[in-house]
Amino acid sequence: MDTFNLLLQGFGTALSLTNLLWALFGCALGTAVGVLPGIGPATTVAMLLPITAKVDITASMIFFAGIYYGAMYGGSTTSILLNTPGETASMVTAMEGNKMAKSGRAGQALATAAIGSFVAGTIGTVVVTLFAPVVAEYAVKLGPPEYFLLMVLAFTTVSAVLGKSTVRGLAALFIGLAVGLIGMDQISGQPRYTGGKAEFLDGIEIVLVAVGLFAVAEVLHAVLFEGKIVETQNRLTRVHMDKRDWRRSIPAWLRGTAIGAPFGCIPAGGTEIPTFLSYATEKKLAKGEDRAEFGHQGAIEGVAGPEAANNATVTTALIPLLTLGIPTSNTTAILLGAFQNYGIQPGPQLFTTSAALVWALVASLYIGNIMLLVLNLPMVGLWVKLLRIPKPQLYAGILIFATVGAYGMRQSSFDLFLLYVIGAIGVVMRRFDFPTAPVVVGMILGPLAEAQLRNAMSIGEGKWSVFVERPVSIFLIVVIVTVLLLPRILRWRAARRAA
């Protein structure tokens, strides 16, 4: 009952005119970002962090949340019409969605994607509403050893999952940890790794690193290395579904949601695995004529299931972010930085210290899902027109936003220099397949992990055995080892079978 009352209070905040406008703006911008290939919600949120620094925190987080799940809706549009996924999570949608478009059923594909996203997003939000407070209630009982191990778990999962190589992921993480050490020592107050530069005494701004690695690096990499995308010509039919489409889509939506929701809750989740699993499930369950459409005319289940799985995963990913402070994707890593930009640390205490903010954010998820359904079904033609924006103008606009935002934080020319140095490093990282999200996670969680490690060692009087004295600590150590070793074991088994 307490949860219901808190949610009602959250609706009271989220339904204010100001917050509704921010939610609408975020959903519209998120959809546009999802439609435009190569930009993504992580880049957009990173770019807007400095610009929204003076905005009320509740309005700002509702705005960022709108961008976050709005991009998932928009990503399906280009996947279906142009075979160009706006988001990596929409890759599976393109497999059947584009074939449907080429066979004259673009309208049905877009409709099942939008409605499926709404169904999965709403169910996912219910899961967040019911389970996030429970996770927070248990997590608040953890001590410094458990908190330190949770952060190590965040380091290992982000490094292992967000890159093609665990080694590259760990290398990126250690870069972030090293950058996070720059500035004043939290205990002694002595400067560390500043190189005698006064500008480094307060450390390097997280926002600066996020904007440099995501926005600036994205643009520079696209300009330097990416070729022109060849667009396919698919006519946009009326967005609707007949009775047969509904009959085939509804079970696929529910199955996709059931597959995607758990993946969002676990630190090693991600959207790629559940969307592929959903596609494989739908293809396996299809029979007769429905099965024959897979890979040929395009099967509607192959769009409905993966889109539902995608949006369920994206929504429930807020559970580990809000309750444990663990990001499971590039965008949630940037959202973690957004909270810190306002001096708030996501974790078990968030539901007590910032309850009004959390429940307004959860309420905005329900509101945003309805907004996105309205935005995506009737206005799909408008979103497709965004693809006509010339790439040079689009990239120039992103760089201008990033530069103005970075300079506006401290009016420092040194920050601008640092922004483009970080951007250049980001280009090199992308070129050699080093993931950038672990850098941001290392920067944010590194100092916090250091503080918890010192507290744990103080409690244990300098003995490392403090980390194996409680069942939760032992369980977390087992999970960390599993996350590091499981991918190698699976690859080894696959290699043996192939041999």
Regions found by a protein language model. Name each.
Residues 68-79, 86, 298-324, 328, ...:
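A structural-propensity feature for long, helix-poor, extended segments
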Residues 41-51, 64, 79-99, 130, ...:
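Re-entrant/interfacial helical elements at transmembrane boundaries that shape
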Residues 31, 47-50, 64-72, 113-118, ...:
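Transmembrane helix-bundle signature of multi-pass membrane transporters/permeases
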Residues 33-42, 80-91, 123-127, 263-273, ...:
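Short helix-coil transition sites and intra-membrane helix breaks within transmembrane domains
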Residues 111-227, 341-494:
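Membrane-embedded alpha-helical modules
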Residues 58-62, 99-116, 288-303, 330-333, ...:
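Membrane-interface alpha-helices at helix entry/exit sites of multi-pass transporters
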Residues 27-41, 70-83, 158-163, 258-269, ...:
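Transmembrane alpha-helix interface/packing and boundary motifs in multi-pass membrane proteins
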Residues 1-60, 133, 137-140, 191-299, ...:
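Helix-loop-helix hairpins and the membrane-proximal interhelical loops
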